[in-house]
Regions:
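A short hydrophobic/small-residue beta-strand
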Residues: 59, 131-132
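Short glycine-centered segments of the SAM/dcSAM-binding site in methyltransferase folds
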Residues: 37, 128-130
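Acceptor-substrate binding/catalytic loop of class I
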Residues: 151-168
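Conserved N-terminal segment of class I S-adenosyl-L-methionine
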Residues: 1-93, 99-103, 115-118, 163, ...
Length: 232
């Protein structure tokens, strides 16, 4: 399965698919400080970059989609701060960023690419710099399998390659970083739904805080990990 084809569609013709991400992205931007140099890996609709820019953050962007990068360069005047490329081979210098954001990215990567990508994050972060991000929580990958009607190939509708729980995410990050937090968190677009759905969301949030309830959209693992030293 070609991940680039899937993401070229969602970031361009299918950009409306990111409309439910605002609560998550606003939360992530609140963790960043004005004046910090921050790299966002995986631009989606460009909403995080826009939110960060309004807060006075020196925001940079990396994404494999050249069309998505061109759009964000033009819309936010990012110039060379927005680059087309891959997380396992970042076109940025060593010790360059105060923080790197990877929200809903790691689940799209094969195991070896995930490890190489985290090594690259470590390389481009300053000492004490933070990796901040999210992945879907305890996703059942088979629930989102679809079949191509033309060729019969079966694949995950969003291109996910891996599912994570808190122990698995902790183990993954420990290889490169000092962990500050790894926990489940529930995001919900309160302003865009009626009272009935708000009540349902509150119930799901309560159950999620206790590791119970349903899986699905808005239920994530949130993580923060810090670069403590240079690799030996």
């Amino acid at each position: 399965m070609n991940q680039d084809i899937i993401w070229a569609h969602f970031q361009n013709e299918g950009v409306a698919s990111f409309s439910g991400a605002t609560a998550r992205l606003e939360f992530l931007v609140r963790q960043l400080r004005p004046g910090e140099r921050v790299l966002n890996v995986g631009v989606g609709s460009g909403e995080l970059e826009a939110l960060a820019q309004r807060k006075g953050i020196d925001i940079w962007a990396l994404d494999p989609g050249e069309r998505a990068i061109e759009k964000i360069r033009n819309h936010l005047s990012l110039g060379e701060r927005a680059q087309a490329g891959y997380s396992q081979q970042m076109p940025f210098p060593d010790v360059h960023f105060d923080a790197v954001v990877m929200s809903e990215v790691l689940e799209h990567l094969d195991a070896d690419i995930r490890l190489r990508s985290l090594a690259e994050v470590h390389r481009v972060l300053k000492i004490g710099g933070r990796l901040i991000g999210t992945v879907p929580a305890r996703e059942r990958l088979s629930d989102s399998d679809v079949v191509c009607p033309s060729c019969g190939h079966q694949f995950h509708r969003w291109g996910h390659k891996a599912a994570f729980d808190v122990p698995a995410m902790t183990k993954l990050l420990k290889g490169e970083f000092a962990i500050e937090t790894v926990h489940e968190r529930f995001f919900n677009e309160w302003d865009s739904v009626g009272w009935g759905r708000r009540a349902t969301g509150l119930i799901k949030k309560f159950l999620s805080s206790r590791g119970l309830g349903t899986y699905g959209a808005a239920r994530n693992i949130y993580f923060v990990a810090r670069k403590a030293t240079e690799p030996s």
